[in-house]
Amino acid sequence: MPLPPPRALSLDLDDTLWPIWPVIEQAEHALHDFLSERCPRTAAMYPIPRMRELRDEIAGQHPHLAHDFTVQRKLSLAHALRTAGDDEVHVQDAFDTFYAARNRIAFYPDALAALDRLAARWPIAALTNGNADLNAIGIADRFVVCITARGVGHAKPDAPIFRHACETLGVAPGELLHVGDDPLLDVAGAARAGIASCWINRRNETWPADLPPPDLQFATLAGLADWLDHRHPLHEPTP
């Protein structure tokens, strides 16, 4: 059955518009530099690999916060400072340092131009489990809204965050196209909510056999923009 033209789009951010791990590594180094200067005992006790392990441990201890990376990070920092004998007053400044670096991203080569093309034709909701700041990154004007797992209280692939996107955009599930890189979080999550999906498969990966396939698949966001322009062209105005 042909995919009907969408009335709106929802778009994942991390690993869809930019690669996330270089960004996280950059932020981890910025945090460690801050701690080395302001809280050297914490920096010595928690080098980057150990701080990463601590964050995973904290996340495991607080499964009810699986949707909130910000609180997970702050709890990790508070634990590290307390354990090392430094003052927990530094938690917010340490987090702010990490977060500023987390928002210094490098777009995939095609992503920004493709986003501009899509935003010129459809209302778009950013739909993310992460905590990127679209204003800091400079792309907030391309989106109608940024819907986060933290704000909704549910993370992808759970249906409530997808339903929230539909409600916010004022469309039915069958009128939304969700776009993202993750087979489970984006594609299977959208399918469970009755929403069509486009898999952005930048690494030419094989589709997991145990998941429902995407409705569309492209190697880049530009590929999706090209397909939509061809499949659903703008009509020229009547003279």
Where are these regions (language model features)?
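Asp-based, Mg2+/Mn2+-dependent phosphohydrolase catalytic module
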Residues: 1-9, 21-22, 86, 112-125, ...
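N-terminal helical cap/lid subdomain that shapes the substrate entry/recognition surface
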Residues: 2-109
